[in-house]
């Protein structure tokens, strides 16, 4: 079983998001983490690079300001990251979410349990 995680982030430092903790919280159970990083006005990109984990794959993108209306740009940027995932499971995590270490084994067990179940499309 191969597990991908994915997210998108822009100006995470300015916005005060715990994006580094977010990324690190799920890294132990994934095989790759795709991060779509928009052109930030802060050190978001260099902070992500400082994690220095071989599982992390960074995609740099430009956000289309025309799509900001009603948050369309967020959906677009999320999908850019998701489409670059190569795992059997694609685990979406936002820059302000952090998973507790005690839950990681339960999450992994559920993914293993339902990996080949055609009736299960997602875990929530």
What does each model-found stretch correspond to?
Residues 3-6, 10, 17-18, 43-92:
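Active-site-proximal specificity loops/subdomain of glycosyltransferases
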Residues 94-98:
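The conserved acidic donor/metal-binding loop of glycosyltransferases
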Residues 26, 31-40, 60-61:
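Short beta-strand/loop segment that forms part of the nucleotide-sugar
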Residues 28, 51-53, 117:
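Short, well-ordered coil/turn elements that cap or connect secondary structure elements
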Residues 7, 12-32:
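Short, well-formed alpha-helical segments that are part of the catalytic scaffolds
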Residues 102-124:
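Conserved donor-nucleotide/metal-binding helix-loop-beta segment in metal-dependent transferases, i.e.
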């Amino acid at each position: 079983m191969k597990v991908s995680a994915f997210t998108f982030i822009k100006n995470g430092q300015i916005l005060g998001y715990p994006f580094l903790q977010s990324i690190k919280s799920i890294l132990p159970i994934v095989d790759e983490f795709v991060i779509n990083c928009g052109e930030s006005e802060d050190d978001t990109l260099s902070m992500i690079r400082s994690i220095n984990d071989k599982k992390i794959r960074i995609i740099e993108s430009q956000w289309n300001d025309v799509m900001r209306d009603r948050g369309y740009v967020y959906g677009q940027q999320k999908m850019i990251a998701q489409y670059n995932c190569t795992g059997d499971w694609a685990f979406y995590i936002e820059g302000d979410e952090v998973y507790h270490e005690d839950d990681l084994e339960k999450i992994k067990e559920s993914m293993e349990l339902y990996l080949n179940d055609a009736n299960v499309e997602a875990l929530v």
